[in-house]
Regions:
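Short alpha-helical segment that forms part of, or immediately flanks, the ligand-binding pocket
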Residues: 4, 26-30, 44-45, 51
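Short alpha-helical donor nucleotide-sugar binding micro-motif in glycosyltransferases
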Residues: 5-10, 97
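Short glycine/acidic-rich beta->alpha loop that forms part of the nucleotide-sugar donor binding site
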Residues: 20-23, 29, 39
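A charged, aromatic-enriched C-terminal amphipathic alpha-helix characteristic of glycosyltransferases
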Residues: 59, 73-118
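Active-site donor-sugar recognition loop in glycosyltransferases
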Residues: 2, 16-21, 42
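Acidic donor-binding loop of glycosyltransferase active sites
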Residues: 8-20, 33
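Conserved active-site histidine-acidic residue motif and adjacent donor-binding/catalytic loop
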Residues: 1-6, 59
Length: 118
């Protein structure tokens, strides 16, 4: 509850660390809030620079400071940010994973048939 309330009141979420995925950045975008993120790791796959947030290139306080100074809270489309975050929902992840496994299984079966092992 408190986290949701804080995200709804925030102008942006600052994600200065290197992470593989970064669930809090996704949660922030689900609340329609842009992300100010270090341009490395999972942020490069979840944040769209200029659309759902902005990147800073170096993991230094100066680079983060410049990003915050250049951030304009009125330049963001909350609905568009929320829509982007939906791509990372549990349901969509399950659908993509299921399709991936099914496709690989079909490829495996096709290889067995082709090699007359099935």
């Amino acid at each position: 509850e408190q986290k949701i309330d804080l995200m709804n009141k925030a102008l942006a979420f600052i994600n200065p660390q290197l992470e593989d995925f970064g669930i809090t950045a996704i949660e922030s975008m689900a609340a329609g809030r842009p992300v100010i993120a270090y341009s490395a790791g999972g942020a490069q796959e979840t944040v769209i620079d200029g659309e759902t947030g902005i990147f800073f290139k170096k993991q230094t306080w100066e680079s983060l400071f410049d990003a915050v100074l250049n951030f304009h809270p009125t330049n963001w489309d909350s609905a568009k940010i929320r829509t982007h975050a939906e791509k990372f929902s549990e349901e969509i992840f399950k659908e993509k994973m299921k399709k991936f496994v099914e496709d690989k299984y079909e490829e495996f079966k096709a290889g067995l048939v082709q090699n007359k092992l099935f």
